[in-house]
């Protein structure tokens, strides 16, 4: 089971929601098979993002994160829901 729910999927983007009740252990380090630009839509409170070998940083509305193919990264749970937009281009 995935730790998120896709709210909207198009050819250009995915709107994805991470629920406030998710178990933090489900937010594992991972790599994606393609480059991604992620836009933070609704960051809740205290949600963070971390690349491998870097310190985590707070997620803020409208923040853009460029994630390269096969780059290790993770999301760190905060309070409330986290909603992101993953641009497929």
Where are the regions that the model predicts?
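Ligand-binding loop in jelly-roll beta-barrel domains
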Residues: 68-89
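Conserved short histidine dyad/triad with adjacent acidic residue
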Residues: 12-33, 50, 66-69
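Loop/turn positions that initiate beta-strands
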Residues: 60-64
């Amino acid at each position: 089971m995935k730790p998120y729910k896709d709210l909207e999927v198009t050819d250009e983007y995915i709107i994805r929601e991470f629920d406030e009740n998710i178990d933090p252990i489900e937010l594992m380090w991972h790599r994606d098979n393609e480059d991604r630009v992620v836009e933070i839509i609704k960051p809740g409170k205290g949600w963070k993002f971390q690349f491998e070998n870097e310190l985590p940083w707070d997620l803020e509305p409208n923040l853009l994160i460029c994630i390269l193919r096969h780059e290790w990264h993770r999301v760190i749970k905060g309070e409330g829901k986290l909603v992101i937009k993953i641009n497929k281009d």
